[in-house]
């Protein structure tokens, strides 16, 4: 049962691996690279197979952006002026919530 309309007002999209994760509210889904097949149907952002480590954090919904680091294998979630990171499996917080600029996220932005 779908609860979000993924045809408009998307929060953010992340291209990683074999497809695109699309986020809206507290839900996400994954399509293949062509965008014509669902690889993961709509689930909670905090569901197993997504990012369960975000449960209980303010990053469990309404995200501004997400970045994947090829270097560390971490997923960085951004919301407002803060960020948090999970491991590649999404089941462990590897960098606790901090300010994006100057707080350990991207210190070079604090100018």
Language-model segments: residues:
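Disulfide-stabilized extracellular ectodomains of secreted/luminal proteins, especially beta-rich
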Residues: 1-111
């Amino acid at each position: 049962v779908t609860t979000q309309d993924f045809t408009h007002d998307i929060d953010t999209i992340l291209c990683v691996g074999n497809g695109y994760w699309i986020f809206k509210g507290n839900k996400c889904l994954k399509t293949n690279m062509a965008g014509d097949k669902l690889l993961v149907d709509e689930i909670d952002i905090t569901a197993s197979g997504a990012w369960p480590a975000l449960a209980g954090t303010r990053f469990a919904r309404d995200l501004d952006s997400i970045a994947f680091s090829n270097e560390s294998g971490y997923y960085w979630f951004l919301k407002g002026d803060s960020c948090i990171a999970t491991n590649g499996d999404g089941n462990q917080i590897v960098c606790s919530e901090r300010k994006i600029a100057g707080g350990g996220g991207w210190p070079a932005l604090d100018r």
